[in-house]
Curated annotation (Swiss-Prot):
Name this protein carries in UniProt: Large ribosomal subunit protein eL20
Function description: Component of the large ribosomal subunit. The ribosome is a large ribonucleoprotein complex responsible for the synthesis of proteins in the cell.
Keyword Ribosomal protein: yes
Gene Ontology BP annotations: translation
Subunit relationships: Component of the large ribosomal subunit.
A UniProt-annotated Pfam family: Ribosomal_L18A
MF (Gene Ontology): structural constituent of ribosome
Organism: Ictalurus punctatus
Gene name, Swiss-Prot/TrEMBL: rpl18a
InterPro entries in the cross-refs: Ribosomal_eL20, Ribosomal_eL20_dom, Ribosomal_eL20_eukaryotes
Keywords annotated in UniProt: Cytoplasm, Ribonucleoprotein, Ribosomal protein
Disulfide pairings: none
Family: Belongs to the eukaryotic ribosomal protein eL20 family.
């Protein structure tokens, strides 16, 4: 899978094709993070074939739909449990991110894993994503924002293009 652009969260439901031996096969549901619905269905069948004796050839996708965030305007802390294949083996990992949406946090996770561990998207398997309370956060990078009186410095930007335009009617504004 290529983790291109912002990933989206899909709910994919699939099952084996009904047969005389098994007329009502059980449904299997997964939360899949993928760039589009085609990749989401493909990842579903990849994971299901690892867990159960099912293949896309003798199965059907019952439902594949986009999952919308409940509150996309509220900043939340996300805990992500994942496993990934590195050059030396398979590792389990727990990571924390702050984001507005679940898919945004997972996208951050894919970018972060690529930067810190050189883990490609196809080698990463997201096992669980959960919104976690501020008092349950473990990572210092996330806990530093749990301050009600948090302050950020005002940037003082110096204009690099000083002679474009050379003559202008107002002084440069460097404080924002």
């Amino acid at each position: 899978m290529k983790a291109s652009g912002t990933l989206r969260e899909y709910k994919v439901v699939g099952r084996l094709l009904p047969s005389a031996k098994n007329p009502t096969p059980p449904l299997y549901r997964m939360r899949i993070f993928a760039p589009n619905h085609v990749v989401a269905k493909s990842r579903f069948w990849y994971f299901v074939s690892q867990l159960r004796k099912m293949k896309k050839a003798n199965g059907e996708t019952v439902y594949c739909g986009l999952v919308h965030e409940q509150s996309p305007l509220k900043v939340k802390n996300f805990g992500i449990w994942l496993r990934y294949d590195s050059r030396s083996g398979t590792h389990n990992m727990y990571r924390e991110y702050r984001d507005l949406t679940t898919s945004g946090a997972v996208t951050q996770c894919y970018r972060d894993m690529g930067a810190r561990h050189r883990a490609r998207a196809h080698a990463i398997q997201i096992m669980k994503v959960q919104v976690i309370a501020a008092n349950k956060c473990r990572r210092a990078a996330i806990k530093q924002f749990h301050d009600s009186k948090i302050k950020f410095p005002l940037p003082h930007r110096v204009l690099r293009r000083q002679h474009k335009p050379r003559f202008t009617t107002r002084r440069p504004q460097t404080f924002f």
